[in-house]
Amino acid sequence: MEIEEASRESGHVVCGSWIRRPKKVNWVLIAKASKRRGSSVSSPALLNIFSFDPITASLSSSPLATHTLKDSDGDPVAVSVHPGGDYFVCSTSKGGCKLFELVGGATGITILAKELLPLQNAGLQKCMAFSFDGSKLAVGGVDGCLRIMEWPNLSVILDEPKAHKSIRDMDFSLDSEFLATTSTDGSARIWKAEDGFPLSTLERSGDENIELCRFSKDGTKPFLFCAAQRGDTPMVNVYDISTWKKLGFKKLSRKTASTMAVSLDGKYIALGGKDGDVSVAEVKTMEIYHYSKRLHLGQSIASLEFCPSERVMLTTSSEWGEMVTKLTVPKEWKEWQIYALLFCLFMASVIAAYVFFENSDSFWKLPMGKDQKRPKISLFGGSSSTPSEDHSRWNLDL
């Protein structure tokens, strides 16, 4: 009780997300609840944007920009950043969603609030997601209503008030064709993003609850990963998106997952636990490559997301705030390193050929004539003999 009171008085981080910028620059959006003392608000709810240093794998000490939410909006609940990096949407505790635009450049940025009329009085929205190509926005409410809209004109594709009992999680497929949603009652459904048509309800056993969902993103493996709970055992189910049939399951964490993420290149999948642990597995083998025990000690991880361009992860919790963790996964070759290696191999082959030619007679021990001389060659050119020497050698009358 004392911990809860202290957290309420000092405010807490609600969620966070990466913002992709040009030239592999990444920012971080952190949504923070208001600070309270008794029944009064001592500090308002904030939306902060921090810069990220890939060398030190850390966030800037002070935000690049800050936006203060009005008291009438309440606290932030969830955020979703557009893939283009210029807009993000934030749902609030007093109902409705807010749209924000990032304006500015290297000298400074500003967060501008804009109207989002279709979602202005939509009620409390638990989760939101932009499609991978940025052409659609989906929002899911605690009342079970699912909305899919075109972006940026916000034309309504689907407004289904009875999609679920209460929507818990959602994710778009890599090709932006499908939308997966999960419910607090343990069910999961698949929707056609283009027209909102319900395609399938995922199969599950009688004692199994599907809680979280993420599509594969490597472009070659058309899978849907779902974090599920079967009795007291947490697991990750894998579904084939061509048939929506379960292919199998894998246990990747000891505790129930509170959030899940797949890296932008689709190579890794991560689970954030209700005990504060984080597990990262390679999608190809489904084996654990990184494990952070008690990263957010005793706290359920509220949000978890891979950095778009680095093997770094952003996690948040109400007690410990935001954390940036460098993953202990195998290092990968960068593009310039591959070209450098190919150049070195080419030079090594040229040098080896030259050395072999210089020592070929002694190697094969072939006899040479009394007046015979072996021609000399240059490492980067042809024969070192002049044209006149060649002509005289063959007694040519030119």
Curated annotation (Swiss-Prot):
One of its GO terms (molecular function) is guanyl-nucleotide exchange factor activity. Its main location: endoplasmic reticulum. Residues 359-398 are lumenal. It is found in: Endoplasmic reticulum membrane. Ubiquitous with higher levels in flowers, roots and senescing leaves. Keywords: Acetylation, Endoplasmic reticulum, Membrane, Protein transport, Repeat, Signal-anchor, Transmembrane, Transmembrane helix, Transport, WD repeat. The chain crosses the membrane at residues 338-358. One of its GO terms (biological process) is endoplasmic reticulum to Golgi vesicle-mediated transport. PANTHER family: PROLACTIN REGULATORY ELEMENT BINDING PROTEIN, SEC12-LIKE PROTEIN 1. This is SEC12-like protein 1. It comes from Arabidopsis thaliana (Mouse-ear cress). The lineage of its organism: Eukaryota, Viridiplantae, Streptophyta, Embryophyta, Tracheophyta.
